[in-house]
């Protein structure tokens, strides 16, 4: 677990999540999609998603990173990958097991087999500073995990609340007891060509896009440190 001093240092740089609309041209989106679809290095996690890891310096996202640095400062990229998913992510953070000085996460929507108006990224008010995790309050059954630990009670989650989330219509894939103690800060629109920027240690999840008859979406995630 991180020390209080380490957490305080991370918190100094926290800012509200934002969406940079129309950050990528349609030709850039297509270029990124073509790279993913033509690659033979895609991996499939035991939890379902397909990923393709990419690196700064490969020339794939270097121009995007450069533009992000002009707005968010001189961060370092600790990991970046394409994701190709057919089910909505549950509540998680985007930490690293080495517990670095985590900074922003950036999500770049590239494609979905439906209307991107029906997809969002849910930002919760809560943070977790103690490693990569998925949040399943109240669960006792064991489940497969690729990298994250499962947090089954929210004692070490910051900013929990006794209030209930009143409108859960967009997160119907999440069990009610998982949401106990959590509150929604904002739902960011998952618009193709935009960039979603948020603190990587903030709890977040997808909306239930499968309920909107969308069963695949592709994008890029970039995780950073300072």
Model-derived segments and spans:
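Catalytic core of non-heme Fe(II) oxygenases with the double-stranded beta-helix
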Residues: 86-203, 207-226
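Non-heme Fe(II)/2-oxoglutarate
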Residues: 2-93, 120, 127, 132-162
